[in-house]
Amino acid sequence: DVYKRQFFNNAKKAKLSATKTLSTGERISVISKTIASDIATTSELGAGKRRVAHVMGMYGTILFWVGSVVMIFFYTSPGSTTPAVWPMIWHIGAALTVLGGSWFWFFLRVDVYSEAQPWFRVIKADLFVLALILSSLFGLIWSYLQSLNLVGRYDDMVFLALFIVANLVLFGGVYWSKFAHMFYKPGAAIQKNLAEADGSRDNLPPEADAPEQFGLGIKREEPKHY
């Protein structure tokens, strides 16, 4: 609630310092470009491993969730046949989520990559990423074990239970996790680009129209000073 108030209060302050009133068409143009670039391709992360991992995890999660919703709610009767494309989407989405999420978790997290913290250090804010990876991983294992038709064994039921628990943690731990991060970041990107377009710039000074004088600064080397 504190962050929400701060977000909207900043937006109100920015309106007061705007130098230009954007038309509806201009707003739509800015928002469309933001969705196509900053959100759909996570361009703010630049070209690199972190961006690839985020794109894999993001689109994997979208495919996984959409496939789950369609198969659960649209093909519910015993006589209905689920088109083969939906299980494919579900499995591809789960695999992308596991690959992108694991890449981020083990190698790209700031506290691991730049601060030398161990990968197994977990705080409340990590619940979302961990539960997201594990729910997809357990779902894939459960699906594989079902395909083996293991008569008289309960291996698949064990991973079904783990799959359910991971999803309960994922959605039940929203209060402590970074789940809201998925929605805050796009909203912040749209506000930032609108602020640049109307001249308010979030009350920051404009960029100087002059050549760089101080070199690369913090971009000179990777942040690994521990």
Locations of regions flagged by a protein language model:
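Hydrophobic membrane-spanning alpha-helices of multi-pass integral membrane proteins
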Residues: M58-V66, I92-S102, K124-S143, A161-V169
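Short, small-residue-biased leader/transition segments that mark boundaries at the very start
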Residues: V2-Y3
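Intrinsically disordered cytosolic tails
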Residues: L130, L134, F138-A161, V165-Y226
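Hydrophobic alpha-helical segments of integral membrane proteins
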Residues: T24-A40, V85-I92, F179-G187
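Juxtamembrane/interfacial segments flanking transmembrane helices
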Residues: K12-K13, F106-W119, Y175-G187
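Membrane-interface amphipathic/juxtamembrane segments adjacent to transmembrane helices
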Residues: F7-T34, G199
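Juxtamembrane "helix exit" motif at the C-terminal ends of alpha-helical transmembrane segments
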Residues: L63-P83, L108, F138-V151
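Membrane-interface segments at loop-to-transmembrane junctions
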Residues: A18-T24, S43-A53, T82-I89, Y113-A131, ...
